[in-house]
Amino acid sequence: MRPSALDQYLAAARSTLVRLEPANAYAATQRGALLVDIRPEFQRRRDGQVPGAIIVERNHLEWRLHPDSAARIPEATGADVEWIVLCDEGYASSLAAAVLQALGLRRATDVIGGLRAWRAAGMPLGPPGEVSAPRLAPEPDSLGSSIGSAA
């Protein structure tokens, strides 16, 4: 059976990534890589959060992490930041990391298997129910104007 268009799209996105197993992702954070949790609040509340992870919901990711964006977070200092994206199962994070790479953030990658694999591997995880607010930056007049043409 031929792979679906979605399977092909995901495979193409992943072909640019050096994806990390949970233990390797955790070790990378201990060396200075930044773990970015893109899961929506209901998933973070239901399953817990990784201590120290930066919370940036998927719909704001590019604007918060790109160093040229007026809406960037303070950690978005340049193209060489090592961003490790985490979602629930490792699908959305692969697509998100590939987009970050396409925008010039060449060290962006994701966690194989997402939070489910992170938990199964025994990596640090806070209790369900407690959630941190997403990381925000001062809102510019137009997010789109900070990286090219207006949205």
Give residue ranges: language-model regions.
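Rhodanese-like catalytic fold shared by cysteine-dependent sulfurtransferases
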Residues: 1-34, 41-83, 89-151
